[in-house]
Amino acid sequence: FLYHLLVMALAPEVWAPHYWFVLMTIALSYPLNPNDVTKKKYYDLIHNIPLLLPVEKLGNDFSNLLDEYPVTPYLDSRDSFIKWTHFIHNKVNQSLDKPEIDFYTALDKYYFHYKPKEIINQDNIRFREKVLFVAIILLTSGLIVYLYKK
């Protein structure tokens, strides 16, 4: 078992979505009006991310993004830090040839994870009922037209 852990590469497809979820959680819980100590701690956290990524190349790429798009000007407010986090996520997606996602869609996807499973199941059932209803209406209408023209 230990051998497999040492040999197996940690696939970004597995850990990266969780990583981005945690980063967005950190940004969304950032103080509205942070003081200098808080700004410094968050600055340090963001600048330590490249060291914490399990794939060295991705860590180096993230470090380059931090050089190109520094976080410092965006640590003055929660809003700007959230937008910077989203912007950086899109920059990483660009570099990986993944589609960019607009800000509000990203927030919707984030908050979807907090939706209780019972509500998700109810929403799915309601959607299926609507699809079934529309299908029945279309079939009935088609049958009426067919019989009328006959």
Provide a role label for each language-model segment.
Residues H4-K150:
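Terminal, compositionally biased segments used for targeting/anchoring and flexible tails
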